[in-house]
């Protein structure tokens, strides 16, 4: 009986974890931090900015299924933890 109860507890924990969704920062540049729950399948947070802007960098943040490719003079950083793209 104890084994059955333990098995049910473990199965419940595993099933609850399957519904996990990522949360990322989504603000543009230096706006106050905002967060977004990412859609299913988007399990990465990203932060992208242009490397050579004379009067400070403009940052773009959000969720992604795959790390976005950096364009010319652009830097992209991706991570796989909640709110890791600040």
From Swiss-Prot:
Gene3D superfamilies: CD59 (2.10.60.10). InterPro entries: Cytotoxin_Cobra, Snake_3FTx, Snake_toxin-like_sf, Snake_toxin_con_site, Toxin_cobra-type. Disulfide bonds join 24-45, 38-63, 67-78, 79-84. CDD domains: TFP_snake_toxin. Keywords: Disulfide bond, G-protein coupled acetylcholine receptor impairing toxin, G-protein coupled receptor impairing toxin, Neurotoxin, Postsynaptic neurotoxin, Secreted, Signal, Toxin. It is found in: Secreted. Pfam families: Toxin_cobra-type. Binds to the muscarinic acetylcholine receptor (CHRM). This is Muscarinic toxin 38. One of its GO terms (molecular function) is toxin activity. Belongs to the three-finger toxin family. Short-chain subfamily. Aminergic toxin sub-subfamily. PROSITE patterns: SNAKE_TOXIN. Expressed by the venom gland. Monomer. GO terms for cellular component: extracellular region. Residues 1-21 form the signal peptide.
